[in-house]
Design a protein with these regions (language model features):
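N-terminal loops that bind phosphate or other acidic moieties
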Residues: 1-66, 70-142
Length: 142
């Protein structure tokens, strides 16, 4: 029996993850097995860690996790969860990255998915200064 595509969990400080998921749904429509877990201000890190473990377990560990930044509480909670589970994911989640992950999750294993998402997103970061200057000149009629 073929394994189901992984659930995608987006975790972050504050409600960034929730709103990122909402924004991606504007592009994809309703997406199955896509969840967010915000670390709310003042939340006990142990409570957050427990919520993350429960969410991972609700998908039998078949998850791919997108985290906002390395080193913060969501990341540390994920690192602890990975001690007892085989997990894959990426840090530095953005809308292009999440779109890439959702587009490829049916065709790639977790390790490949992480490498692909990181690679594509490196190419998505660009300096728009030259482009904006060109647009400004067009606006001025130059």
């Amino acid at each position: 029996m073929e394994q189901q595509a992984p659930a995608i969990l987006v975790i972050s400080h504050g409600f960034f993850c929730r709103e990122l998921v909402n924004s991606v749904k504007m592009v994809f429509g309703d997406v199955a097995r896509l969840e967010s877990l915000p670390l709310e201000e003042g939340m006990d890190p142990e409570v957050y860690e427990e919520q993350l473990n429960q969410l991972i377990d609700s998908y039998d560990g078949n998850v791919f996790v997108c985290v906002d930044i390395m080193g913060g509480t969501p990341f540390k909670s994920l690192a602890k969860a990975a001690r007892t589970r085989c997990l894959y994911g990426v840090a530095g989640v953005s809308m292009p990255m999440l779109i890439e992950v959702l587009s490829d999750r049916d065709e790639m294993c977790g390790k490949e998915l992480a490498a692909q998402a990181a690679s594509v997103c490196r190419d998505m970061i660009m300096d728009l200064s030259e482009y904006m200057e060109k647009m400004h000149k067009i606006g001025l009629g130059e």
